[in-house]
Amino acid sequence: MTHTALPVATVVFGPEAAVATGHALVLAPVTPSWDEGAFFAPVIEVLAGAGLRVTVADTLSLWDETVDSMAVFTARWRELLPGFGPVDLLCGNALGGAVAQALLPEAGPATAALLVSGPTRTDALLEARLGEIADLAASGRPGEALALLNRRVLPSGSASERDAGPTPDADEAAGRRLAAGMRLLRGIDLSPAVLGHPGPLLQLVGERSQLVTRRHTAAAPHHEVHVVPGTGMRPHFEQAAHVSALIRAFLREKGLQ
């Protein structure tokens, strides 16, 4: 595991560039602090196992108080993208998935995309649920915000959702990240970037997700959206074997293994 010198928190997994079969760039979801790729561990294992060099980036590293929209935020990522070098597979989870979709026009026509619970567009219900988390975080209650987020990422109606544990610890910095990340997703519609992408794309969403669902995605005829049975926002953990098999098949089909 290595780190890059880019002005964003990153960690790199997999073989050295000289022997890798390709390069995957993974953009992180909203997390209370940078977890160095733990959020995507099962997928990283699959990608690295297929011979890809995997760079995982903390998406919110490029956020500050002057960023007030997804357009401004993705403009920053657009400027940074060339610094990662050639990207064969652009990946993103949740907020990172949204940013990855916004970057598709800059990624190149042959670049493959792998998205997990990455919204292409929002609607009133999704924005209300994200806004509730953001408002708690912004009002000095980051622990409550994180507890609500932890419930919302679970499958709807699950026992663990009904029997939530104690409010987790979260400091002011975590609250700023939570509020910023949730609010960046307000009013987005990245459909033109997705529908216009000529490369392959696989989007995975949970059948019982309380947040990002099939209706929040877009896909061209040559793309694939797969709804993972029984899962919430983290199908790659909840149905790891099933999701890993889908990703391996996608990599083989697209010549990335």
Segments (PLM) and residue ranges:
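Catalytic histidine-centered segment of alpha/beta-hydrolase-like enzymes
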Residues: 231-244
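Short beta-strand/loop motif that positions the catalytic acidic residue
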Residues: 196-197, 203-205
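Conserved HGGG/HGGXW glycine-rich cap/lid loop of the alpha/beta-hydrolase fold
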Residues: 2-66
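Flexible "cap/lid" loop of the alpha/beta hydrolase fold
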Residues: 105-140, 177-180
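Conserved alpha/beta-hydrolase catalytic His-Asp/Glu region
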Residues: 124-126, 142-193
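Gly/Ala-rich beta-loop-alpha elbow adjacent to hydrolase catalytic centers
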Residues: 91-100
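Conserved acidic catalytic loop of the alpha/beta-hydrolase fold
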Residues: 48, 70-88
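Conserved alpha/beta-hydrolase "acid-adjacent" motif
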Residues: 205-206, 210-216
